[in-house]
Regions:
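PLP-dependent enzyme catalytic core of the Aspartate aminotransferase-like
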Residues: 6, 191, 207-255
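Short, well-ordered beta-strand elements within core beta-sheets of diverse protein domains
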Residues: 113-122, 172-180, 233-237
Length: 255
């Protein structure tokens, strides 16, 4: 990153941490330190962590963006987004663009997001606790069943130490897993869960499951952004963790 910034001026460095769907972790403070040295601002997509777990502005970021459709709304019934800034000049620019483009949420959608904020902390802590249990169980499965588990709460995750430092109270509710039997096994697996619903969204109280390569990330196949075909992304809800694990087990047993 520093090499790129030193050779050309950029207005922003964009960061998503944890990233979708491989949950890669970026050190926000270190990124901000380098970017600011070259007069570049840092914008962080904090959707996966939510403001309950991670505070990018406190770590040096200049702009934070959210899909409020996900954890902030939390009930799979609103579509929205938010931009959070820490200086008046940037706020005025964003407000002007919002007004000019008409990107203003309805009163009801705003009410739904405000309602979600009331329980955000409780929900995200339960999401995180359940996700850690699910990730640990998946990681304990034989290597001929589970190739790899991606979850920043696991010590095996390459970004675990950074995540533990900059995330507070949990590691989020998203777990990604690669099945050893390949892409068709991944599709068969998600077709046979009973509690997990096959759907593309995430962050609601109910558990969802999908195959990114065939669904959310199908459009980036063949590019540097493509994801493994055997990858399954799991949005772990707030149901009983033992029930969720039992559901995953019976679906794996059917492969």
């Amino acid at each position: 990153m520093e090499t790129a910034l030193a050779s050309k001026h950029y207005q922003y460095v964009w960061v998503e941490t944890p990233s979708n769907p491989l949950l890669n972790i970026t050190d926000i403070a270190a990124t901000a330190e380098v970017a600011h040295k070259y007069g570049t601002k840092v914008a962080v997509d904090n959707t996966f962590a939510s403001p309950a777990l991670q505070h990018p502005l406190a770590d040096g970021a200049d702009v934070v963006v959210y899909s409020t459709t996900k954890y902030i709304g939390g009930h799979s019934d609103v579509v929205g987004g938010a931009v959070v800034v820490n200086d008046e000049e940037t706020r005025e620019k964003v407000a002007f663009l919002q007004n000019a483009a008409g990107a203003v949420p309805s009163p009801f959608d705003s009410w739904l997001d405000i309602r979600g904020l009331k329980t955000l902390d409780l929900r995200v802590k339960r999401h995180s606790a359940n996700a850690l249990k699910v990730a640990e169980w998946l990681e304990s499965q034989p290597s001929d069943v589970i190739e790899r588990v991606w979850y920043p709460g696991l010590e095996s995750h390459p970004g675990h130490e950074i995540a533990a430092r900059q995330m507070h109270g949990g590691f989020g509710g998203i777990v990604s897993v690669q099945l050893a039997a390949g892409a068709e096994a991944a599709k068969h697996f998600v077709d046979h869960t009973q509690i997990f619903t096959l759907a593309e969204s995430l962050g609601g109280v109910e558990s969802l499951i999908e195959v990114p390569a065939a669904m959310t990330h199908a459009s980036v196949a063949g590019t540097t952004l493509q994801v493994p075909a055997n990858l399954v992304r799991i949005s772990v809800g707030i149901e009983n963790a033992d029930d969720l694990i039992a559901d995953l087990k019976q679906a794996l047993d059917r492969i």
